[in-house]
Curated annotation (Swiss-Prot):
Listed name of the protein: 7-carboxy-7-deazaguanine synthase
Family: Belongs to the radical SAM superfamily. 7-carboxy-7-deazaguanine synthase family.
Naturally occurring in which organism (per UniProt): Koribacter versatilis (strain Ellin345)
Binding of substrate, residues: 10-12, 25, 69
This enzyme's EC code(s): 4.3.99.3
Function as written in the Swiss-Prot or TrEMBL entry: Catalyzes the complex heterocyclic radical-mediated conversion of 6-carboxy-5,6,7,8-tetrahydropterin (CPH4) to 7-carboxy-7-deazaguanine (CDG), a step common to the biosynthetic pathways of all 7-deazapurine-containing compounds.
Catalytic activity: 6-carboxy-5,6,7,8-tetrahydropterin + H(+) = 7-carboxy-7-deazaguanine + NH4(+)
Amino acid sequence: MQITEIYRSLQGESSYTGIPCIFVRLTACNLRCAWCDSEYTFKGGRKMSEDEIFAEVQKLAPGGLVEITGGEPLLQERELVPFMERLVASGYKVLIETSGERPLANVPQDVVKIVDVKCPASGEGGSFRIENLDALTPHDEIKFVISDRADYEFAREFTRQHGLENKVSSVIFSPAFRKDARGTRDASHCLVDPQDLANWVLEDQLDVRLGLQTHKFIWTPETKGV
């Protein structure tokens, strides 16, 4: 597989926020989101065998949480699926973060899918494969990264229309960060004020989780390897 980086940090998103986690970040993405914070994954990386990747993961921690991310990791599905199965068989709790643009049917059942449905302001709205809803299980999660009120309304209606609260364990509404965010560790970098987003969720009585990218408040937004 083509790998951009492997490192250990704290999980900064999803319902697993705050838990120590090994991140295996795969190279390449077929989307170009307006607010993308990982453009460095689009090209480059290094070719690694399954054994080499597994050895690096074990060196960082013999067990615990592993997230497969990117880029879009399912672009390398053929090699990735057996690797995820190996991690699960070795006792790791495995998450995969994906846009849902690629089919999800072959992701192992024990792997938690964290699906980032793209909102209109991302420039990739409509990229989600609606048939992937049938591949979701009760332990999976869906995330919407929200840049403005229109994005919020899209996420709200998508959630209601498809009954997501009853389909997955968590539906997460997260404010997008500015692409040029640098230096300070505060909410001023968010494209939509987290307080506004919280108020909208409360006003509409949505059964969703407000998610902040915690790592961008612990470290600076541009810091890599965290």
